[in-house]
Amino acid sequence: MQDPLIQFNRDPATAGISVAPDADGFYDMGDVYKAVPATDKIAFVIRHSKRQKNLGKESELTPIGVQMAQTLGSKLVSDESFYYASTDFVRTRETCNNIAIGRGETDAEVVTWDGINGGYFLTVPSDTLDALVSSKGGNQKYIAQYAYDEIVAAPSFKDQLVSYFQDFYPRGNQFVNEVILANMSSWKRVSILVSHDMLVEPLIVFVSNRTIDLKIYQADYRWANYLSGIAVISNDAGCVTVLPVRGDSVGWMINSQEVDESVQ
């Protein structure tokens, strides 16, 4: 299934991939990996696993986050080795390492890559966006409203806010073409690229053509879950398929319901 705004196939059956989404529209990463023909290349771009409350670069995975990543790895077990890349954050690198451990890879290398930094959909540094919206609901609210083209704000504030974001559909197509497909030939058949919610939230909305509910600004206040993201699948016939995927049991989370491991 294609849409004029999206340059890629969104129906796995068209590419000979027998896999079904869950009730929320997400495809399980393990199911996708098993269903994709062995001649196809796959790149998974996902959010890191559950991390400590600190948002700085040194924030580590929590015990639950370590287990989540290793459980995901156990669903991706095979004889082939994967390519792993992360941003320059401890939590993204640890996510790669623990997925590899779950797969049984003991010597996996994790490449640090700026190409998957969280600010891809922004025209300004993320700190600039934070400064503008910190007292008006925070960046998650406005990143989601941007992705769904539902920004609600006073005209002058809205004009400034809109200028901080790239054009949504062209930028999504550009990411798949220039960040993923342009580099696939130098990666292994399967790649795990671990980034942040600021990148993954818009990507999921993009590849689902705004059909998945991650509207944190309205009830049920859903946001991209840890280990959720997209799969980009390329076959020998030149068909490129993009799918929203999840590495955990559900693709979304509600921030207020997140388990606080610091009080356990």
Model-inferred region functions:
Residues 3-121, 146, 154, 158-168, ...:
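Active-site-proximal alpha-helix that buttresses catalytic centers in soluble enzyme cores
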Residues 33, 72-76, 96-103, 129-136, ...:
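Hydrophobic, Leu/Ile/Phe/Ala-enriched alpha-helical segments that form helix-helix packing faces
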Residues 48, 87-89, 189-198, 245:
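Short, well-ordered beta-to-alpha junction loops that form the rim of enzyme active sites
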Residues 53, 112, 119-182, 186-188, ...:
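Flexible, surface-exposed loop/gating regions in the mature catalytic domains
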Residues 58-59, 206, 254-259:
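Surface-exposed beta-strand edges and their flanking turn/coil or helix-capping segments
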Residues 166-239:
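Active-site-adjacent alpha-helix immediately C-terminal to a catalytic or transition-state-stabilizing loop
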Residues 239-264:
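Low-complexity, Gly/Ser/Thr/Pro-rich intrinsically disordered linker/tail segments
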